[in-house]
Every structure is written in structure tokens, then in C-alpha cells.
Amino acid sequence: MSILITRPSPAGEALVSRLRALGQVAWSFPLIEFVAGRELPTLADRLATLTENDLVFALSQHAVAFAHAQLQRDGRNWPVAPRYFAIGRTTALALHTVSGFDIRYPLDREISEALLQLPELQNIAGKRALILRGNGGRELLGETLTARGAEVSFCECYQRCAKHYDGAEEAMRWHTRGVTTLVVTSGEMLQRLWSLTPQWYREHWLLRCRLLVVSERLAHLARELGWQDIKVADNADNDALLRALQ
């Protein structure tokens, strides 16, 4: 089994290193990269207006990293007042590391549906919620918080940019190297991988690979695109992906 990891740097390379240490054949093929978001310069002032009744949500490690770097450039700290939430354990740890605060997060899955089930988020009418995220992505969290009566705003902390590849060249490379398992961690990357691959390689290689994804939503999308051998990891971090690949 040869494994192709499509998640971005540095998590993709880290997973490849761990797999190789276990004797697996694995390759990194990041489909997207990240650059600073256009709303970052407004972050410090927006955070400063929040009170102890308000909420801050971090939706990825990348949002935390770019936000913290901007606060450092501005000579500001993470404010003590608001309550902090994260999409999952890995993002919560990243936010705790840079802020020192307790971060609330769902214990089961790193998805918006699980985050929204937290008891602290059931009665939030009149509270302000600032969501730190990248460009695009799902709107479920913001829409649900708004429906529950919160005043929701967003800060685009980073932008996802597609990395440019020659699709035919890459497909031939991975087919020749005997890749039989693909690891994909977002719908955007799944669509990118499918569209990047020429039709012949799509039919004779890509869609015949075993596909590891991180949610049932992604599995459904994969089935619509033509994959049949699909496995869903129990979480989105590298530990969960490593377990699923054993």
C-alpha cells in the first residue's frame, strides 16, 4: 500500500514522516496553501470590544496561527474577557498555547455540528460571536449561532489558495508509484483532486483508490464523485488519520 497525503503543510509532511517511521510508503501532495487573510489588520480592535458575555470561535489551527502572529505584530495580547471555543482538540490546544486560556471544544468530532451541541452554546441570545476562519468554508456555525440570537461576525484570518500542478504529470507520477490510498481532509481538496486528474487516470487509477476522509459529509461527496472504497476517520487530526491507516 502506497499512501498519498493531500493535506496542507506542515500537517501533511508530519503525517508522512510518522507513516514512514512505521514502515509505510507515503508521499505528501498538498493541494492548497495558506496566506494571510485580508481582515487580519482589524482583528486586535475587534477582539478588544468583546466583553465577558461574548464568544470567540477558532475554526482551525491556521486561523489561530495567523491571528496570533497579527496580534504580536500589533503588540497586543489575546483579551481575557470573552469565552473561547475551538472546532476540536488540536485547534483548542493551539489556541491555549498562545493565549494561556481555557478553551471549550467538542470531545467527539472536529465538526461544526459537534461544536454546536456544547451546553454553553444553547442559550446565547444577545451575545456577540466573533468567528476566526479562512475564506470560504461552511456557513453552518454562523447561521446556527445567528438563529439562536447571537450577533455574529467573521474575521478572515487566512486565505486558502490552490497550489498549481500539471494534472497529467502528477497523475502519472502517483499512478507509477503505485499509490492505492488517498487521504483527503476537506471537500475543497477532494474536488480539487478530482478535477486536477485527467479522465483516463481518474477512471483507471484515482477512483479505484481507497479513500480516507474525515466526515460523513465528505464521504457522501466522494460517493457522488465516483469513489466506492471510502473510510471515515474518527477525527480530523493526524493521530486519528494514523489510526485509520493502520
Swiss-Prot record:
Transmembrane segments: none annotated. GO terms for molecular function: uroporphyrinogen-III synthase activity. The keyword Lyase applies. It catalyses: hydroxymethylbilane = uroporphyrinogen III + H2O. Keywords: Lyase, Porphyrin biosynthesis. It is an enzyme of class 4 (lyase). Pathway: Porphyrin-containing compound metabolism; protoporphyrin-IX biosynthesis; coproporphyrinogen-III from 5-aminolevulinate: step 3/4. One of its GO terms (biological process) is uroporphyrinogen III biosynthetic process. It holds the Pfam family HEM4. InterPro entries: 4pyrrol_syn_uPrphyn_synt_sf (IPR036108), 4pyrrol_synth_uPrphyn_synth (IPR003754), UROS/Hem4 (IPR039793). Its EC number is 4.2.1.75. Catalyzes cyclization of the linear tetrapyrrole, hydroxymethylbilane, to the macrocyclic uroporphyrinogen III. Belongs to the uroporphyrinogen-III synthase family. Monomer. This is Uroporphyrinogen-III synthase. It comes from Salmonella typhimurium (strain LT2 / SGSC1412 / ATCC 700720). The gene is hemD.
